[in-house]
From Swiss-Prot:
Its main location: plastid. PROSITE patterns: RIBOSOMAL_S2_1, RIBOSOMAL_S2_2. SUPFAM superfamilies: Ribosomal protein S2 (SSF52313). One of its GO terms (cellular component) is mitochondrial small ribosomal subunit. CDD domains: RPS2 (cd01425). This is Small ribosomal subunit protein uS2c. It comes from Cuscuta reflexa. One of its GO terms (molecular function) is structural constituent of ribosome. One of its GO terms (biological process) is translation. The gene is rps2.
Amino acid sequence: MTKRYWNINLEEMMGAGVHFGHGTRKWNPQMAPFIAAKRKGIHIINITRTARFLSEACDLVFDAARRGKKFLIVGTNNKAADSVARASRKARCHYVNKKWLAGMLTNWSITETRLNKFRDLRMEQKKGGLNHLLKRDATMFKRQLARLQTYLGGIQYMTGLPDIVIIVDQHKEYTALRECITLGIPTICLIDTNCDPNLSDISIPANDDAISSIRFILNKLVFAICEGRFSYLINP
């Protein structure tokens, strides 16, 4: 994997609050190598390590995108949801930002059935199928479609398992992470000081509570994916 320059600026990381970890009482000792200090009861993340692993992750996704690989970005906590959706749309990645449905990957055949149902309902709506339903039935139709849009809207064009999964907030998305491990899908995980860095293929130590920190990390990864896709288009 070729190393590239991704303009990861330490001052910008500080400004985004990437270095702020959790309280010192809420930490995983496995994170000790990534912690630089303690300040006012919280751990301070060593952002030089963050920059190193973020750069490695950018190299990985660039090379994968250049080979036409598919990505899934997962982040369902309230602070991550909007950033995940925005970043995913920009890089044309699949995403889950509301709720991870257990078995979404490990029971792919069931997920595929749900996606087909979702697509059928959307097609029916576009054709004006609602116009021929009773008011009560139309209400139920809309409710079902809205629910599917909420939980499956970000993966509606997914036709198979992703090649790489990017996860924001290891604790919140532990089920998704375990499914990736079970299936052998490579993962890139944003990890705070209460996480286990050994569970992902690439763990990026960073504040997973601040929107600015999440956005900083995702923006770098998305830029690398977009660059890789462009390289794929001009050199297929």
